[in-house]
Amino acid sequence: IDKKVQRTKNRPLACNLISVKLALIYTSVLCSLAFLILIQFNILTIFLGFASMVLAFAYPFMKRITYWPQFFLGLTFNWGIVMAWAAITNNISYEILILYASAIFWTLGYDTIYGTQDVADDEIIGIKSTSIKFKNNIKLFVSFCYLASSALIIYLFYSKFGLNNFSLLVIIYILSLVYQVIIFEKNDPKKCLRAFKINNFSGLFLFFGIFLIN
C-alpha cells in the first residue's frame, strides 16, 4: 500500500531500502527487549502488555476492512496510559479510563486530519479511513472528536481537583485543538500537516497540565 501512496512511497520498506526479512529481524529484537522490560512489572501490567500486542498487530490491517482505522489507532496508541497506571497502582480506575477515552478521541481527531493528505490515493487503491468516510463533513467530525476529548478532560479535572485547581495548561491544550480545526483545509495537504504537527505541543501542554497539578 505504501508504494501506491505519494506521501509514503519513499518509506524504507516501500522503496526497498531495507528488506522484509531485515524488518522482521529488527521487529523481533525490539519485541524481545520490550518483553524483558515488561516482565519486571506486576501481573496486571504484564497481562495488559500482552493484550496490547493484539491491538498492535491488528491495527495495520484495519484500513483494509473498516472506515474506522483511526479509532483502532486510538485504542492501540494510547494503551500505554492504562499500562502506566497499572504499573504504578496495580489497578485500573475509572479516572484512568476517562483519560484513556479522552486520548482516543484526540487521536481519532488528529489522525483524521493527517489522513486527509492521502484521501485521493486511498480512494484509488481502495483502502478506508475516517478521512474518507467523513470527507464531506470533516471539520465537523474532527470538531466532535476534539470536543469529546476536551469534555472528558474537563470532567476528569473537575471531579478530581475541582475548579480552583484547574490547570491553565489544560486550557491551552483545548485551545490548541480549536486552532487546528480553524487552520486545516481538507484540500490543502500542507495545512493538514501543519495542523497535525501542532499536536506535538498539544500533548506537551496536557502532560504538564496533569503533571504539575499532581
Label each residue range with its predicted role.
Residues 2, 6, 110, 114-115, ...:
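Alpha-helical transmembrane segments and their lipid-water interface positions
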Residues 44, 108-124:
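Membrane-embedded alpha-helices of multi-pass transport/permease systems
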